[in-house]
Amino acid sequence: MALKNVIGIDHAVVMVKDLDKAAENYKRLGFTVSPRGTHSAHMGSGNYTIMFDPDYMELLGVLTPTEHNAPARAYLEKNGEGIERIAFTAVDSAEGAEEIRARGYPPVGPTDFERPVTMPDGTVSAAKFRTFQWPTAEAPGGVRIFACQHKTRETVWIPELMKHANGARRLKQVLMVAPEPAAEAAHLAKMIDRETRNEADGAVAVPSGGDRADFVFLTKDQLGKRYPGVSLAGLPARGGAGLVIAADVAAAEKALGVAGVNSAGGVVVPPAAGNGTMLAFVKA
């Protein structure tokens, strides 16, 4: 039975070494990037968001080493930049935490935090969240998962931030590479109480819930066959590999220019040009 307080993918977290440089890179790729946010002191992190509907991407960087960001720092040290964790939307984080506890996963949290937000009219407000994590050791495909309850959606989904020159509209898939995709997919499906779905090329998908993006687990070789002509240099053998983004493909092609590679009926940014994250723009 699916979790009642956890619905599908809320956002993908791309861990980066230099936050400001990463934001500039994503602007060059045609994304509208939010002003920089600084999280509560115990988090020790800062971010930029790239807002879609109903989901988003987060560029996350460590500003001050803290106990809370130790796993993120360890990830950067081991893997370099890339998709470090995936957030689900939480309806109620306290109840969601109890739901996963009942399924044998002691939750980390709930944790409350916030960050100041400069609104389009120049006023300063706050984005407030309550999150909980599955145990950090439970990382299917090498990617941690957590759930995020948005207390102030109006300071996160700001209309001016949701229009992108590259035509990006929403996340369609989170691509995860692994030597044994079926085992990793089964691990995730158990954690979120969902079913797996076998795909024609041997990849295994896990719907995240609702109408949100799917997880797709596949080998690096399978990923290469899905996106011929796209260099996968820099991707780990096991970990978050990329995001499939529903978009206006013509707008993406124009905005990306030489950074984009025409492949699989869309236009693709190789991971080396996307801070360790392959970005595949496909027809919305």
Located regions from the model:
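Short acidic/glycine-enriched loop/turn segments that link adjacent beta-strands
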Residues: 41-44
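Glyoxalase I/VOC metalloenzyme domain signal
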Residues: 2-9, 14-34, 52-112, 119-284
